[in-house]
């Protein structure tokens, strides 16, 4: 292996180890990237974007572990209920569930939040987003509370009792209602 490749491999290995420990990041170690991070180095550096999170951590009596949650991203903050954002999607790894993608293909607009949760909670999160929309937003021009929410999954089954169905509508409501700008925890 050439010395340059070995040096890069060592640098990347050290970066991964220190980042996992919460220390310096690649940019801080001199690895060049295009652009400059925002003041928070977070998605909320984009004007108007708000994020809400609910994390569920519980050790159950039968030794199962709950390690899951919900993240809600509102691209225009609370205005996301009335003001659409241009949007598109793609399959990063060829599988995984994401609701609302047919409407993104057809209309090219996101009408509301993006919600992320575990694989087996996509359905409850989708339904909760629609319920939240009806309870908190105004009807559209036709008089309907119309929504095809964008809810995506991530597999957390190695860490979480994914078959326990621990994510409930209330968790989704809390993430949506708690969405704010500023630092993302």
Predicted regions and their residues:
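Alpha/propeptide regions of enzymes that mature by internal proteolysis
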Residues: 21-185
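Positively charged n-region of N-terminal signal peptides that target proteins for export
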Residues: 1-5
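Bacterial N-terminal signal peptides
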Residues: 7-17
């Amino acid at each position: 292996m050439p010395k340059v490749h070995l040096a890069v491999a060592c640098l990347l290995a050290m970066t991964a180890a220190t980042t996992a420990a919460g220390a310096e990041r690649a940019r801080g170690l001199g690895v060049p990237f295009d652009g400059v991070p925002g003041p928070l180095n977070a998605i909320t550096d984009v004007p108007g974007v708000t994020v809400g999170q609910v994390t569920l951590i519980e050790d159950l009596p039968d030794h199962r572990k709950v390690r899951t949650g919900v993240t809600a991203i509102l691209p225009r903050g609370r205005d996301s209920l009335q003001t659409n954002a241009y949007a598109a999607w793609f399959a990063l790894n060829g599988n995984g569930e994401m609701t609302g993608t047919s409407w993104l293909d057809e209309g090219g607009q996101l009408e509301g939040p993006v919600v992320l949760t575990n694989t087996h909670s996509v359905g409850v999160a989708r339904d909760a987003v629609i319920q939240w929309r009806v309870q908190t937003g105004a009807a559209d021009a036709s008089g309907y509370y119309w929504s095809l929410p964008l809810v995506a999954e991530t597999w957390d089954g190695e860490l979480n009792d994914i078959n326990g169905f621990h994510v409930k509508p209330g968790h989704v409501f809390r993430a949506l209602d708690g969405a704010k700008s500023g630092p993302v925890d």
